[in-house]
C-alpha cells in the first residue's frame, strides 16, 4: 500500500502512517468535488458569484469567466454550435464547483450569511433524500394487471417508512420523499413462452403442477437477452428523468441538492442497474460531468468515492456499459479488444447482441450465421443508438430480491472479458436484500470475489429487537479481517474463481487502484487496522472491484414455514413482503441518515455507548444473567410520568423477561435517555442505573437537569442486550385540563375471556381526537397489570388512537378500581391537574364520583340504568351521537389553562413492539398471487379510520392476558 501515484513510485509521505498518507494524498490529489457532501443549498447566477467572491479569491472568479468564454468559442468553432441551454448548464456547473470550494459545513449546521432573507429563501428545500422506487414487479408478473397495484405497494412502503421514522428517526420526518417510477414487465413474454414449454402445459387439470414446473431462474435471463430489453432500459431512464424533473419543479424539490437513492425490486432492480451503468458512460459528458459522477460522495460516510471522482471522469471501465470485451466474432483476433466508438456507452447491448449472436452461431452456424454477421457489418449504425442518461446522481442503490447475480453471471459466461470491477455501477454503495428461500434472488458478492461464497450474507437486524441496529459492522474491511484465512493470496489459488480477475486489474488506471486502497484504509480507523492481517495486495484486489465500502448481500428473516409453500407462490409473497418490512425500512433509514447519526454520537451530553451501533453491547455484570435470559423475550416497561412544573421528576422502569414476568433482570446496567428536543430526534443520556432484585430502577432527575414544560420521550436501554423500554415524561403547568378515558370501560366493545383482540366501539377514536383537538391532555387509565403495557399500547396504536399518557396497575392487584381512584387523586393533588370529562363503564362511576366530578362530566357508555341515572351521563346512542352533541352544543370548549403547554397532535407510534400484535397467520398475502387492493381514489379522512375492522381476525383466540391483532405484515417473531 506504500506504492501509489501515476508513476508507480512511492506515495507522498513515504513510510508515514496510513492516516498521514491519506491526509497527504488528499492535499495533493483532491478534486473539485472533494467537498460535494457539503451542503449546496445556495443561490446560483449572480448571487452565486457574490457569495463566491466573499468566500473565494477574485482570481478564481476571473478564471471561471474566462473559462466560460473559451467554452463558448470552442463550441462555436465546432461542427455543431452549442445551444444556450448547454452553455447555461456549463456555467451553472462552474458555479457549483466554485461554491463547493467554500467548504460549507455538513447538513444541519449551515450558517446563514448576511444575505439574509433572500439567501434563506433559496436554501429552504426541506427534502434531503429522494427515494426513487423503480417498481417492475416480480418475474411472474404479466404486465397486464392494474397499474394501481404498483401504487398500492408504494403506498404501503411509504406508510411503513413514516411510522418507523416517527418512532425512531423523528429527525428525518419531512426530509425524505418517495417517488414512484413504473417499469415495464420485461419478464412477461418469457414467462408466457416458458409456460408453454413445460411438459404439463397441455393438461389443464394439472395447473398447479404445470406452474411449479416453470424454471423461475430462467425468466430474467431470457428477458435481458431480448433486443427489446435495451428499449426498456431507455424507457426507465426517460421516466426517471421526467419524474425527477417534475420533482424539481414542485414545492418539495425547489432548491434540492440532497442525495438521490434508487430502490429496485425484482425486475426494477435489473433495469435500474443497467440504467446506472449507462448513465456512467462518457457520451454527452460536459465539463461538469465529472462532478456529476463524483456526487456519490455526498452520501458516503467515508472518503472512498470522493477519491474515486477523478477516476470516474477519466476511466471508461466503471460499468458493463463501457467495457472492453474480447470479441468472439470470426475474422478478428480474440485477444484484441473491440475498437471503442465515441458513444459505446449507449451501444453496449447492441455489441452484446453481436457477441451473443456470434456465440450462438458456433452452435447453430447454419441458421444464425447470417444474423450473427449482420450486426457486425452494421456496427457504425449501432453507435447512433442513444439510451440517454440519468439527470441526477445516484448515491445508494437498494435491490429487493433481484436476480441481478444470475444476469451478470450469464453475461460473464457469454462475454468472458467482463469482470466484477468493470461492471461497477456509478453509485457509492449497492445493497442487495433477499430472503434465502426466494427462488428469484441471488447473491452478488461471489461474483466480485469467488471466496465470498463461503462467507454468509449479512443478516438484517430485526426491527422489533434492534430498531437502531445490532452493532454488527457492515464494512468490507471488517469482513476481510474476520475471514482473513479465506482471502489470503495463497489460499485463493486452489479453487477456480467464478471471475478470472487478476491479482490487480490491469484494465484499471493505476491511480484508481491506489485511491481505492487508500480510501479503504481511511474509511474506518478500526477497520483499516483490522485488515492488516490480510495481505495488502489481496485486500486491494478485492476492494478495487467492490461496489462501495460495505457488504453487498443482506439476508432478511425468512420463516421456516415458507418451505411448505408452492414455489410459484413465493415470488409474489416475497415481493409483497419487501414493501411491508420494517426491517428493510429501518435498515435503509440507518444508511441514508448516516450524517445525522454521526452528529448525534458526537454531540455533547449524549451517551455514545448506548447509541453507537459500532459498540452496542456490553458483557453482563452477572454470569447467571445470560443463562437466565436464554429462550425468553423481553417484556420491559416504563411508566408514563406526569410531573408538575416545579415538582420532582421520577422515572420508573421494570425489566422483565417472558410473557408472565418469569425472569427479572437483576443487577444489570440500564442507560436512561431522554429526548430533550423531540423535533431534533436526539437522545440525551441522563444516567446509568443498576436494576434491583425485582428488575426495577427508580431515577430521580437531578434538579439542574430537570426538564421544562412539555412532553419528552424516555428510553431505558439494557446494556447487555440493547432491549429497551419506552415511555413519556410530561411536565405540566398548574391547572392543566385533562380528559380521562378508561380503556376497557369506554373503548372495548367486546369482552374476551381468552384475551383475543377486543373490538373498538364505533366513533371512540373520533371522540378522543375531538378532545385532543381542543387542547386537552388525554389520560388513558386501566386496571390491567403493567405487564400488559406493550399489548395495550400496540392495540391503541393499531386502532389509531390519539397520543396520550397511559397508566396501569402495579402488577396484579385485588381492587383495581381503588387503585384507579388513588392514582387519579394523586395526580390532582400533586400535579394540580383538572379533570374536565371522564369516560368509562358503570364500574368507573364510583371512581369518578370519589374524585368529586359532577354528573355532567362523567360519561358512561352503555344502556341507562335507574341506579346510576343521576350520577352520570349515559351515552346510550353511542359515540357518534355523542360527538355530534359535543360539536353542536357548547358542552366542550377549548382548554383555558396556560398556553405554554402545547400538546403534539398525533397517534401512537411504533415504540410499542409490533411482535405483540402478531396473530395466527403471519402471511396475509394469499397464494392466489394477487396484488393488494389499490387505495381508494378518495381516501377516508383520518377520523373515519376509527371504525371497527372486520371480524375475520377474531376466529382463533390467543393465550390468556393477550391483547393482540395481526397486522397485514409479512414478518413474524423469530
Swiss-Prot record:
Gene3D superfamilies: HAD superfamily/HAD-like (3.40.50.1000). Belongs to the PtdIns transfer protein family. PI transfer class IIA subfamily. The modification Phosphoserine is found at residues 30-31, 109, 295, 298, 321, 343, 495, 612, 907, 928, 946. It comes from Mus musculus. It is a peripheral membrane protein. Residues 390-594 form the DDHD domain. PANTHER family: PHOSPHATIDYLINOSITOL TRANSFER PROTEIN, PHOSPHATIDYLINOSITOL TRANSFER PROTEIN BETA ISOFORM. Residues 520-533 have a biased composition (Low complexity). It is found in: Endomembrane system. SMART domains: DDHD, LNS2. This is Membrane-associated phosphatidylinositol transfer protein 3. Keywords: Calcium, Lipid-binding, Membrane, Metal-binding, Phosphoprotein. SUPFAM superfamilies: HAD-like (SSF56784). The keyword Membrane applies.
Amino acid at each position: 500500500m506504500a506504492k501509489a501515484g501515476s508513476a508507480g513510485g512511492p506515495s507522498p509521505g513515504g513510510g508515514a502512517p496510513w492516516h498521514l498518507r491519506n491526509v497527504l494524498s488528499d492535499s495533493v490529489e483532491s478534486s473539485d468535488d472533494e467537498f460535494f457532501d457539503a451542503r449546496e443549498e445556495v443561490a446560483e447566477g449572480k448571487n452565486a458569484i457574490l457569495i463566491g467572491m466573499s468566500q473565494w479569491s477574485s482570481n478564481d472568479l476571473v478564471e471561471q469567466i474566462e473559462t466560460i468564454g473559451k467554452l463558448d468559442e470552442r463550441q462555436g468553432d465546432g461542427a455543431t454550435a452549442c445551444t444556450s441551454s448547454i452553455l447555461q448548464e456549463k456555467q451553472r456547473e462552474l458555479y457549483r464547483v466554485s461554491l463547493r470550494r467554500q467548504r460549507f459545513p455538513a447538513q444541519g449546521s449551515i450558517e446563514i450569511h448576511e444575505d439574509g432573507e433572500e439567501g434563506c429563501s433559496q436554501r429552504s428545500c426541506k427534502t434531503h433524500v429522494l427515494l426513487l422506487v423503480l417498481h417492475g414487479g416480480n418475474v411472474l408478473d404479466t404486465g397486464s394487471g392494474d397499474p394501481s397495484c404498483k401504487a398500492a405497494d408504494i403506498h404501503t412502503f411509504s406508510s411503513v417508512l413514516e411510522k418507523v421514522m416517527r418512532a425512531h428517526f423523528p429527525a428525518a420526518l419531512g426530509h425524505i420523499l418517495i417517488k414512484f417510477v413504473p417499469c415495464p414487465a420485461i419478464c412477461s413474454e418469457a414467462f408466457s413462452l416458458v409456460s408453454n414449454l413445460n411438459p404439463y402445459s397441455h393438461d389443464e387439470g394439472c395447473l398447479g403442477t404445470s406452474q411449479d414446473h416453470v424454471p423461475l431462474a430462467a425468466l430474467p435471463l431470457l428477458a435481458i437477452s431480448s433486443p427489446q430489453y435495451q428499449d426498456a432500459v431507455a424507457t426507465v431512464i426517460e421516466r426517471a428523468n421526467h419524474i425527477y424533473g417534475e420533482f424539481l419543479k414542485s414545492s418539495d424539490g425547489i432548491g434540492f441538492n440532497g442525495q438521490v437513492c434508487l430502490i429496485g425490486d425484482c425486475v426494477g432492480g435489473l433495469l435500474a442497474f443497467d440504467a446506472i451503468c449507462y448513465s456512467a458512460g462518457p457520451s454527452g459528458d460536459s465539463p461538469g460531468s465529472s462532478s456529476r459522477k463524483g456526487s456519490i460522495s455526498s452520501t458516503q460516510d467515508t472518503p472512498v468515492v470522493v477519491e474515486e471522482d477523478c477516476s470516474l471522469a477519466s476511466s471508461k471501465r466503471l460499468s458493463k456499459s463501457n467495457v472492453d470485451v474480447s470479441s468472439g466474432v470470426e475474422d478478428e483476433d480474440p485477444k484484441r479488444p473491440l475498437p471503442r466508438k465515441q458513444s459505446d456507452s449507449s451501444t453496449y447491448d447492441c455489441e452484446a447482441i453481436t457477441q451473443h449472436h456470434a456465440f450462438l452461431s458456433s452452435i447453430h452456424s447454419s441458421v444464425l450465421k447470417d444474423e450473427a454477421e449482420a450486426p457486425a457489418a452494421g456496427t457504425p449504425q449501432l453507435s447512433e443508438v442513444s439510451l440517454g442518461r440519468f439527470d441526477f446522481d445516484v448515491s445508494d442503490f437498494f435491490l429487493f430480491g433481484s436476480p441481478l447475480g444470475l444476469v451478470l453471471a450469464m453475461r460473464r459466461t457469454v462475454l468472458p472479458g467482463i469482470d466484477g470491477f468493470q461492471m461497477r455501477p456509478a453509485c457509492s454503495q449497492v445493497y442487495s436484500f433477499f430472503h434465502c428461500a426466494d427462488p428469484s434472488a441471488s447473491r452478488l458478492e461471489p461474483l466480485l470475489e469467488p471466496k465470498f461464497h463461503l462467507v454468509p450474507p449479512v443478516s438484517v437486524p430485526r426491527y422489533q429487537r434492534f430498531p437502531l441496529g445490532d452493532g454488527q459492522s457492515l464494512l468490507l474491511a471488517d469482513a476481510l479481517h474476520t475471514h482473513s484465512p479465506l482471502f489470503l493470496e495463497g489460499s485463493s489459488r486452489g479453487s477456480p474463481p467464478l471471475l478470472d480477475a487478476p491479482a490487480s486489474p490491469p484494465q484499471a488506471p493505476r491511480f484508481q487502484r491506489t485511491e481505492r486502497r487508500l480510501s479503504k484504509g481511511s474509511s474506518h480507523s478500526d477497520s483499516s487496522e483490522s485488515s492488516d492481517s490480510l495481505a495488502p495486495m489481496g485486500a486491494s484486489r478485492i476492494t478495487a472491484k467492490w461496489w462501495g465500502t460495505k457488504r453487498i448481500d443482506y439476508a432478511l428473516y425468512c420463516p421456516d414455514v415458507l418451505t411448505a409453500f408452492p414455489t410459484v407462490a413465493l415470488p409474489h409473497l416475497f415481493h409483497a413482503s419487501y414493501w411491508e418490512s420494517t426491517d428493510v425500512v429501518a435498515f435503509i433509514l440507518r444508511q441514508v441518515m448516516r450524517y445525522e447519526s454521526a452528529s448525534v454520537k458526537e454531540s455533547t451530553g449524549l451517551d455514545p455507548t448506548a447509541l453507537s451501533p459500532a459498540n452496542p453491547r456490553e458483557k453482563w455484570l452477572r454470569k447467571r444473567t445470560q443463562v437466565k435470559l436464554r429462550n425468553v423475550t423481553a417484556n420491559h416497561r416504563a411508566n408514563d410520568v406526569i410531573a408538575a412544573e416545579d415538582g420532582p421528576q421520577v422515572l420508573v422502569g421494570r425489566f422483565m423477561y417472558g410473557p408472565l414476568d418469569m425472569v427479572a433482570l437483576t443487577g444489570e446496567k440500564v442507560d436512561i435517555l431522554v429526548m430533550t428536543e423531540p423535533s431534533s430526534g436526539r437522545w440525551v443520556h441522563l444516567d446509568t442505573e443498576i436494576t434491583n432484585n425485582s428488575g426495577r430502577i427508580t431515577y430521580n432527575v437531578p434538579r439542574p437537569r430537570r426538564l421544562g414544560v412539555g412532553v419528552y420521550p424516555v428510553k431505558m436501554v439494557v446494556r447487555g442486550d440493547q432491549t429497551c423500554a419506552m415511555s413519556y415524561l410530561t411536565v405540566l403547568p398548574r391547572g392543566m385540563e385533562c380528559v380521562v378515558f378508561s380503556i376497557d370501560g369506554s373503548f372495548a366493545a367486546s369482552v374476551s375471556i381468552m384475551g383475543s383482540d377486543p373490538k373498538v366501539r364505533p366513533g371512540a377514536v373520533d371522540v378522543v381526537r375531538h378532545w385532543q383537538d381542543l387542547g386537552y391532555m388525554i389520560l388513558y387509565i386501566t386496571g390491567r397489570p403493567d405487564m400488559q403495557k406493550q399489548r395495550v399500547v400496540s392495540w391503541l396504536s393499531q386502532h389509531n388512537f390519539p397520543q396520550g399518557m397511559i397508566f396501569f396497575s402495579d402488577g396484579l392487584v385485588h381492587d383495581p378500581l381503588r387503585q384507579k381512584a388513588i392514582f387519579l387523586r394523586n395526580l390532582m393533588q400533586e400535579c394540580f391537574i383538572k379533570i374536565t370529562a371522564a369516560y368509562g363503564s358503570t364500574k368507573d362511576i364510583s371512581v369518578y364520583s370519589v374524585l368529586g366530578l359532577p354528573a355532567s362530566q362523567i360519561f358512561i357508555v352503555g344502556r341507562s340504568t335507574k341506579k346510576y341515572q343521576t350520577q352520570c351521563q349515559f351515552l346510550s346512542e353511542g359515540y357518534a351521537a355523542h360527538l355530534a352533541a359535543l360539536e353542536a352544543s357548547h358542552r366542550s370548549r377549548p382548554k383555558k389553562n396556560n398556553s405554554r403547554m402545547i400538546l403534539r397532535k398525533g397517534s401512537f407510534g411504533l415504540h410499542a413492539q409490533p411482535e405483540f400484535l402478531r396473530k395466527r397467520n403471519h402471511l396475509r398475502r394469499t397464494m392466489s398471487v394477487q396484488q393488494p387492493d389499490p387505495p381508494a381514489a378518495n381516501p377516508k379522512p383520518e377520523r373515519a379510520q376509527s371504525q371497527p375492522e372486520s371480524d375475520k381476525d377474531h376466529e382463533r383466540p390467543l393465550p390468556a392476558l393477550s391483547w393482540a391483532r395481526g397486522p397485514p405484515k409479512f414478518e413474524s417473531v423469530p
